[in-house]
From Swiss-Prot:
InterPro entries: PLipase_A2, PLipase_A2_Asp_AS, PLipase_A2_dom, PLipase_A2_dom_sf, PLipase_A2_His_AS. Disulfide bonds join 42-131, 44-60, 59-111, 65-138, 66-104, 73-97, 91-102. It holds the Pfam family Phospholip_A2_1. It is found in: Secreted. PANTHER family: BASIC PHOSPHOLIPASE A2 PA-11-LIKE, PHOSPHOLIPASE A2 FAMILY MEMBER. Expressed by the venom gland. The keyword Thylakoid does not apply. It comes from Daboia palaestinae (Palestine viper). Its EC number is 3.1.1.4. Keywords: Calcium, Disulfide bond, Hydrolase, Hypotensive agent, Lipid degradation, Lipid metabolism, Metal-binding, Secreted, Signal, Toxin. This is Acidic phospholipase A2 VpaPLA2.
Length: 138
């Protein structure tokens, strides 16, 4: 419980894109987005290595790969425009880099929603030391 409190305090200062991504996750899963996924499995959160532990963790792996294709802005810091229309996330930026970041986040949020049945609390706050298998390629 103490660790979750620390994570919550750290996230209170998060601005811009990460709060946008959390909002997308919340809309698609009904969960408190960032807290539910920030340190889940081997790929959700900062960095990532090893083998994705389940379909939820694979959503994060694919999200990391997507960020790796973004050029011209920092995916973790860029603020983009988006809206929710009839339950769908719609990215609305004219800037190609910001639109790409939004699309990465949109696809990941949808993936989390589609794979909620694989979410397993044993992978919350998962140890980095359990992610030592060879990493897959994007």
């Amino acid at each position: 419980m103490r660790t979750l409190w620390i994570v919550a305090v750290c996230l209170m200062g998060v601005e811009g894109h990460l709060t946008q991504f959390g909002d997308m996750i919340n809309k698609k899963t009904g969960t408190f987005g960032l807290l539910s996924y920030v340190y889940y499995g081997c790929y959700c959160g900062l960095g990532g290595k090893g083998k994705p532990q389940d379909a939820t963790d694979r959503c994060c792996f694919v999200h990391d790969c997507c960020y790796g294709t973004v050029n011209g802005c920092d995916p973790k810091l860029s603020t983009y425009s988006y809206s929710f229309q009839n339950g769908d996330i719609v990215c609305g930026d004219d800037d190609p880099c910001l639109r790409a970041v939004c699309e990465c986040d949109r696809v990941a949020a949808i993936c989390f929603g589609e794979n909620m049945n694989t979410y397993d609390k044993k992978y919350m706050l998962y140890s980095f030391f359990d992610c030592m298998e060879e990493s897959e390629k994007c």
